[in-house]
UniProtKB/Swiss-Prot annotation:
Organism classification: Eukaryota, Metazoa, Chordata, Craniata, Vertebrata
Compartmental location: Cytoplasm
Organism: Gallus gallus (Chicken)
Role according to the record: Conjugation of reduced glutathione to a wide number of exogenous and endogenous hydrophobic electrophiles.
Domain of life: Eukaryota
GO MF entries: glutathione transferase activity
Similarity-based family: Belongs to the GST superfamily. Sigma family.
Record protein name field: Glutathione S-transferase 5
Length: 28
């Protein structure tokens, strides 16, 4: 479960970062 939770957190964090980069790219 710990490994799964870590993987989920990493994936979620990467998705958020990608969204932020995409938003920044569109804004600038």
């Amino acid at each position: 479960p710990n490994y799964k939770l870590t993987y989920f957190n990493l994936r979620g964090r990467a998705e958020i970062s990608r969204y932020l980069f995409a938003y920044a790219g569109i804004k600038y």
